[in-house]
From Swiss-Prot:
Part of the ABC transporter complex MetNIQ involved in methionine import. Responsible for energy coupling to the transport system. It comes from the Bacteria. This is Methionine import ATP-binding protein MetN 3. ATP binds at residues 36-43. The complex is composed of two ATP-binding proteins (MetN), two transmembrane proteins (MetI) and a solute-binding protein (MetQ). The gene is metN3. It comes from Pseudomonas fluorescens (strain ATCC BAA-477 / NRRL B-23932 / Pf-5). Its main location: membrane. SUPFAM superfamilies: ACT-like (SSF55021), P-loop containing nucleoside triphosphate hydrolases (SSF52540). Keywords: Amino-acid transport, ATP-binding, Cell inner membrane, Cell membrane, Membrane, Nucleotide-binding, Translocase, Transport. It is a peripheral membrane protein.
Length: 325
């Protein structure tokens, strides 16, 4: 688990804070997306997580250890558990794919035969088993990023930090890289922190998310909680409501339900019990953060406003969230 506590970063006297009292918690095995526009402080925050950037104040706890309190040798050991992938790939063009992935293992002093076995295993994992002897110039952008991911995994990290890793890729390649990251999270149990300016990236694979603006944390939490909170701007951005004409005299609500929650049969049962005639104005199901999320817009006659509210209360007791409009 990573805990960020009241983190501040100021680059110079009189300069605005790049990070201003940011606090958040990244649970173990989460895919945590940090969303924001250019200049929001995303990259600064990510670089602070492994102390490539030293914060001006505040603390970063990783597995309970305060990184800022570690000695140089202790910090080096801690960093061995943190992999990082970059927007620009950062590959050595004079070395083969195999030799690029082997760099962290060479630094760690692993023997040649062990290095080779580990590298070939990783190349199979990222779908480049046939590219070991190729050079970066012979690869596509997506393949280069797969090499970068394999290199980041070489030392067997517990955490993987992704700095806009898909922003230079086309949509199809972006989708394949995100699928690979989701697979790595699922199969290896890594905790992944990724920064992005694209809502679709968060929507595709993130279990948790935070939004930054002007160096400040706007909101954070589990994606499911954000989607179910009518007050969450990030939740509304990830899954916008229905833009329908609104009759102010007619009670309406928007329901949010997840995975195997069966909203339609439950609505039918409860409305029948209350002799309430409901109209379904709109509905749909989408995949968000690896979960199925459904939305329904429902309405009733003005005379049934009391029964309608009772229905929403009964739905809430069964785990289906609603926003009265």
């Amino acid at each position: 688990m990573i805990e960020v506590q009241q983190l501040c970063k100021v680059y110079g006297e009189g300069q605005p804070a790049a990070l201003d009292r940011v606090s958040l918690t990244v649970p173990d095995r989460a895919v945590y997306g940090i969303l924001g526009r250019s200049g929001a402080g995303k990259s600064t925050l990510l670089r602070c997580l492994n102390l490539l950037e030293r914060p001006s104040s505040g603390r970063i706890l990783m597995d309970g250890q305060d990184l800022g309190a570690l000695s140089a040798s202790e910090l080096r050991r801690q960093r061995q558990g943190i992999g990082m992938i970059f927007q620009g790939f950062n590959l050595l063009h004079s070395r083969t794919v195999e030799d690029n992935v082997a760099v962290p293992l060479e630094i760690a002093g692993l023997g040649k035969s062990q290095r080779r076995a580990r590298v070939l295993e990783l190349l199979e994992l990222v779908g480049l088993g046939d590219k070991a002897q190729a050079y970066p110039s012979q690869l596509s952008g997506g393949q280069k990023q797969r090499v970068g991911i394999a290199r980041a995994l070489a030392a067997g990290p517990r955490y993987l930090l992704s700095d806009e890793a898909t922003s230079a890729l086309d949509p199809e390649t972006t989708a394949s890289i995100l699928q690979l990251l989701a697979q790595i999270n699922r199969e290896l149990g890594l905790t992944i922190v990724l920064i992005t300016h694209e809502l679709e990236v968060v929507k595709a694979i993130c279990s948790h998310a935070a939004s930054l603006a002007g160096g400040r944390l706007m909101e954070s939490g589990a994606v499911a909680e954000l989607l179910g909170n009518p007050q969450s701007a990030l939740g509304r951005a990830l899954l916008p409501g229905y833009n329908l004409p609104f009759n102010g005299s007619q009670p309406q609500a928007e329901l949010t339900f997840f995975d195997n929650q069966r909203a339609a049969p439950l609505l039918e049962q409860l409305s029948r019990q209350q002799a309430l005639e409901l109209k379904v104005l709109a509905g749909g199901v989408e995949a968000v953060g690896g979960r199925r999320v459904g939305r329904l817009r429902i309405a009733a006659a003005p005379a049934d406003a009391g029964k309608f509210q009772q229905l929403l209360t009964a739905l809430a007791q069964r785990g289906i969230r609603s926003e009265r409009l």
